[in-house]
């Protein structure tokens, strides 16, 4: 059983908290400290952003984080090194990479999949890879035991949902809002209806992200989805608390986890 499946099974019907940070923001040492701190405060799965120069799906908060990481020279290989170092002391917590196809394409799908598996990556989500064209990367990930994680948006067609249901591993990431990460208004009733609809086709957990910024919104989403994904709020706390990132983010993660139990 994969680490992601084990993580959901261990919750025994409880809901997973999946926090997101950008690797290398503000630096590699802090990234590792944040990863361990988030796990210590209740994170069930970690989502690591791979910095990219044109993060079209991300709002201004995560865009700035990517810019800071790129200014530090962070590459995809550095991201894999971070996971490798994390695995030296944590072999249980699943790690998912979230990013864009270009850096993966540059490395080569086979080499990336092999190196990701060796480093201890459990899942990969490339936000700009339509399900219709992802087959070459999907095959390499599958051959190396790494889950291919897909986004589903409010506008995703039924045919595409069916295709994703056949291919997806780990969990499916439902984008609760149209637009970019960090967007504001969240209609939990609409999300609930959509999750119920998606589970007609999808039999693995569904995580909801975009627009979840506090314990109250996390609690509401936790009532209807198997996982709650929080990114922009955490990245904003990192941006606003230089030198004290791990403590502030740890406290926020604990608050969020307490809300979704």
UniProtKB/Swiss-Prot annotation:
GO molecular function list: tryptophan synthase activity
TM region(s), chain numbering: none
CDD domains membership: Tryptophan_synthase_alpha
Reactions mediated catalytically: (1S,2R)-1-C-(indol-3-yl)glycerol 3-phosphate + L-serine = D-glyceraldehyde 3-phosphate + L-tryptophan + H2O
Enzyme Commission number(s): 4.2.1.20
The UniProt record lists the keyword Nucleotide-binding: no
Keyword check for Transcription regulation: no
Enzyme category, top tier: lyase
Highest taxon in the source lineage: Bacteria
Pathway: Amino-acid biosynthesis; L-tryptophan biosynthesis; L-tryptophan from chorismate: step 5/5
Gene Ontology annotations for the cellular component aspect, listed alphabetically: cytosol
Active-site residues, record numbering mapped to chain: 47 (proton acceptor), 58 (proton acceptor)
Alphabetical keyword list: Amino-acid biosynthesis, Aromatic amino acid biosynthesis, Lyase, Tryptophan biosynthesis
Family: Belongs to the TrpA family.
Biological role stated in the UniProt entry: The alpha subunit is responsible for the aldol cleavage of indoleglycerol phosphate to indole and glyceraldehyde 3-phosphate.
PANTHER family: TRYPTOPHAN SYNTHASE ALPHA CHAIN, CHLOROPLASTIC (PTHR43406:SF1), TRYPTOPHAN SYNTHASE, ALPHA CHAIN (PTHR43406)
Subunit record text: Tetramer of two alpha and two beta chains.
HAMAP family reported for this sequence: Trp_synth_alpha
Protein name, UniProt field: Tryptophan synthase alpha chain
Gene of this entry: trpA
């Amino acid at each position: 059983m994969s680490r992601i499946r084990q993580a959901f099974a261990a919750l025994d019907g409880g809901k997973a908290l999946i926090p997101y940070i950008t690797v290398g923001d503000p630096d590699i040492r802090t990234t590792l400290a944040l990863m361990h701190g988030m796990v210590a405060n209740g994170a069930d799965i970690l989502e690591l952003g791979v910095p990219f120069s044109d993060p079209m799906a991300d709002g201004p908060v995560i865009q700035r984080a990517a810019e800071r990481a790129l200014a530090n020279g962070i590459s995809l290989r550095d991201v894999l090194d971070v996971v490798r170092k994390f695995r030296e002391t944590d072999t249980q917590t699943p790690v998912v990479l979230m990013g864009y196809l270009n850096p993966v394409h540059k490395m080569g799908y086979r080499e990336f999949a092999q190196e990701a598996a060796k480093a201890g990556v459990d899942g990969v989500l490339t936000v700009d890879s339509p399900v219709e064209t992802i087959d070459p990367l999907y095959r390499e990930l599958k051959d190396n035991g790494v889950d291919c994680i897909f986004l589903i948006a409010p506008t995703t067609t039924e045919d595409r949902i069916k295709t994703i249901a056949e291919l997806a591993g780990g969990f499916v990431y439902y984008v609760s809002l149209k637009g970019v990460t960090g967007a504001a208004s969240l209609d939990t009733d609409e999300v609930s209806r959509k999750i119920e609809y998606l589970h007609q086709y999808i039999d693995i957990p569904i995580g909801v992200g975009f627009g979840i910024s506090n314990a109250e919104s996390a609690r509401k989403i936790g009532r209807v989805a198997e996982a709650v994904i929080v990114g922009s709020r955490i990245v904003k706390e990192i941006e606003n608390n230089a030198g004290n990132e791990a403590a502030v983010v740890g406290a926020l993660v604990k608050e969020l986890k307490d809300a979704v139990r």
